[in-house]
């Protein structure tokens, strides 16, 4: 697959043809999407999905989705036809995939699990696009209701990640511009020099991939990401020690922290999708990419020296090139 082309061409689609999406197709998309993510991770599965494909199942899901509106003051003021229209849109959609992640016993574990399911959802969207299937990633706050949680069987220790509504598209929505990665890019301590020239890990090659990767889904086109590249000097040495990784260079992918918790969660998911795009694109490069979420990124004092701002957080540290081993580090400093 030409990942660059698919990533750039994929669109969020809200209107679908009446052609059904076969269960076998959905199963194949899920299996391949999970495999693509596992190729970069430890293979552990901390997520599950539910498929609403039959008319009865779609009606049931739609009822749970509008339950919060109907029971609210706003719902009592809205015309019945408007609520019926919202329900009809959900029931007419050929299929819905609900994704759920395990919460985890620590913030780091919860983030790792959520990042995994978001990455898999992005893979599903990209793979589906190649088959002519468009999707909409839905996380509206109207889903925050007891009726919806009962319908999807949300358990204690689980977290709702989103719904992928899907169907074959007849018309491709127009493209919406993305901000070039260069405008959200900072280099600390210089570029790669000599350390890995033979592996071609340079700021230029990383930026080329990022300018494709930024075509990730993000609500309201907030583009909540920023990139900090450490290709040499003290910053790269410090990251090698912190990560226990003899990488040629590092890319810190940072998310802006919104005050609104719902936006904050949506933005984190968007950055995870961008990172997944980057990893898929980098698979054709001569240098490997290792996606890590080490413990130190949760300590603001460790993040400050790399230029992470007060209202930002590191979503992942991407180790670029090298073999992943650092003889200067003790085993306890390695990510497990």
Give the role of each language-model region.
Residues 149-161, 302-315:
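Short, electropositive alpha-helical surface patch
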Residues 1-92, 186-249:
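N-terminal amphipathic, basic helical "cap/leader" segment at the start of enzyme domains
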Residues 3-13, 25, 160-205, 314-336:
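C-terminal helix-cap and adjacent tail motif
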């Amino acid at each position: 697959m030409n990942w660059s082309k698919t990533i750039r061409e994929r669109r969020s689609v809200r209107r679908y043809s009446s052609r059904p999406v076969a269960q076998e197709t959905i199963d194949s998309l899920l299996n391949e999407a999970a495999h693509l993510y596992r190729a970069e991770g430890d293979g552990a599965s901390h997520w599950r999905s539910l498929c609403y494909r039959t008319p009865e199942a779609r009606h049931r899901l739609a009822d749970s989705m509008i339950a919060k509106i109907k029971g609210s003051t706003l719902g009592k003021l809205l015309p019945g036809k408007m609520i019926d229209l919202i329900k009809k849109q959900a029931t007419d959609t050929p299929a819905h995939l609900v994704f759920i992640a395990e919460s985890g016993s620590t913030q780091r574990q919860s983030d790792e699990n959520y990042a995994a399911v978001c990455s898999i959802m992005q893979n599903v969207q990209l793979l589906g696009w190649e088959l002519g299937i468009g999707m909409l990633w839905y996380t509206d706050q109207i889903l925050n209701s007891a009726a919806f949680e009962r319908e999807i069987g949300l358990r204690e220790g689980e977290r709702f990640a989103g719904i992928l509504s899907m169907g074959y598209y007849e018309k491709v929505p127009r493209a919406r511009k993305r901000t070039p990665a260069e405008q959200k890019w900072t280099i600390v301590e210089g570029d790669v020099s000599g350390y890995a020239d033979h592996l071609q890990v340079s700021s230029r090659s990383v930026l080329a991939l990022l300018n494709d990767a930024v075509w990730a889904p993000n609500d309201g086109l907030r583009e909540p990401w920023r990139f900090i590249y450490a290709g040499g000097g003290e910053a790269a040495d410090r990251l090698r020690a912190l990560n226990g990784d003899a990488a040629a260079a590092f890319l810190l992918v940072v998310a802006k922290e919104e005050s609104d918790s719902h936006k904050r969660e949506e933005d984190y998911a968007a950055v995870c999708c961008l990172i997944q795009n980057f990893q898929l694109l980098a698979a054709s490069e001569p240098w490997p990419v290792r996606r890590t979420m080490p413990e130190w990124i949760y300590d603001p004092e460790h993040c400050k020296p790399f230029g992470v701002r007060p209202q930002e957080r590191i979503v992942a540290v991407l180790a670029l090139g090298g073999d992943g081993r650092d003889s200067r580090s003790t085993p306890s400093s390695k990510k497990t």
